[in-house]
UniProtKB/Swiss-Prot annotation:
One of the primary rRNA binding proteins. Required for association of the 30S and 50S subunits to form the 70S ribosome, for tRNA binding and peptide bond formation. It has been suggested to have peptidyltransferase activity; this is somewhat controversial. Makes several contacts with the 16S rRNA in the 70S ribosome. PANTHER family: LARGE RIBOSOMAL SUBUNIT PROTEIN UL2M, RIBOSOMAL PROTEIN L2. NCBIfam families: rplB_bact. Gene3D superfamilies: 2.30.30.30, Nucleic acid-binding proteins (2.40.50.140), Ribosomal protein L2, domain 3 (4.10.950.10). Residues 226-278 are annotated as: Disordered. SUPFAM superfamilies: Nucleic acid-binding proteins, Translation proteins SH3-like domain. PROSITE patterns: RIBOSOMAL_L2. GO terms for cellular component: large ribosomal subunit. This is Large ribosomal subunit protein uL2. The gene is rplB. SMART domains: Ribosomal_L2, Ribosomal_L2_C. Keywords: Ribonucleoprotein, Ribosomal protein, RNA-binding, rRNA-binding. One of its GO terms (biological process) is cytoplasmic translation.
Length: 278
């Protein structure tokens, strides 16, 4: 879908660039495939802020998206493409031959009326699901499982994809958007194609108020705070913080390695940080 610019009637309109969603369904979602979504304002169950600068925003209904696609060898027809406020990608409503409906992530080049299917050996076309071990090398996929049967976890945002670049015994080698290459078990499933809405990366929010509609509050820098609020705070007049950049909790930021999960290091063949070292 194309980008949409607006007449500069106000400063916010002048800067605004949005994705043209005129081709999407304009009605309400299927009620049986939705549930209420409680806004927590960045607080956890004890009421403490765990994510700063969250709060407000438009009320949303959560769409139950099927990331597992366990209904195998049953064709489904794409009924319509919809906007989902809970994610950057678009979603597709599919209807199986037995009458069951489900929401899935809409891949690029999926159109209303197309047929999708999940199975061990299916056609390599957008929206179909099959185990990674049965796919030809070079296939572009999204919604990739990391654990067998857990459901897709990799490449779910707008425009993202992973590519199958090789095989190694029971595993396949996947190249991710970040440049990382990692091993994934061949029995893990993935959906063929890249995720829809690739133009999401080119949008311009236009004004601060639109960010508030999305549930984000103003972000304050540490150097403008008081010493009680941030390690960079305080000082007479404007200061640079007086130390190497740290988080509000005193941990080094801007490049310090924080990964501690050594048990899965063996699955990462090429780190996503390798390109930065060149």
């Amino acid at each position: 879908m194309a980008l949409k610019k607006y007449n500069p009637t106000t400063p916010g309109q002048r800067q605004l660039v949005m994705v043209d969603r005129s081709a999407l369904y304009k009605g309400k979602p299927v009620k049986t495939l939705t549930e209420g979504k409680h806004s927590n304002g960045g607080r956890n169950n004890t009421g403490r802020i765990t994510v700063r600068f969250r709060g407000g925003g438009h009320k949303k209904t959560y769409r139950l998206v099927d990331f597992k696609r366990t209904k195998v060898d049953v064709p489904a027809k794409v009924e319509r493409l919809e906007y989902d406020p809970n994610r950057t990608a678009f979603i597709a409503l599919i209807k199986y031959e037995d009458g069951e409906q489900a929401y899935i992530l809409a891949p690029q080049r999926l159109a209303v009326g197309d047929t999708v299917i999940a199975g061990a050996y299916v056609d390599v076309k957008p929206g179909n699901v099959m185990p990674l071990g049965n796919m030809p090398i070079g296939t572009i996929v999204h919604n990739v499982e990391l654990k067998i049967g857990k459901g897709g976890q990799i490449a779910r945002s707008a425009g993202t994809y992973a590519q199958l670049v090789g095989r190694d015994h029971d595993y396949v080698i996947m190249r991710l958007n970040s440049g990382e290459q990692r091993l994934v078990h061949g029995r893990c499933t993935a959906t063929i194609g890249a995720v829809s809405n690739p133009d999401h990366m080119n949008i311009s929010i236009g004004k601060a108020g639109r960010t508030r509609w999305l549930g984000w509050r103003p972000h304050n820098r540490g150097v403008v705070m008081n010493p009680i609020d941030h390690p960079h705070g305080g000082g007479e007049g404007r200061t640079s913080g007086g130390r190497h950049p740290v988080t509000p909790w005193g941990k080094p930021t801007k490049g310090k390695k924080t990964r501690s999960n050594k048990s899965t290091d063996k699955f990462i063949l090429i780190s996503r940080h390798k390109r930065k070292k060149k």
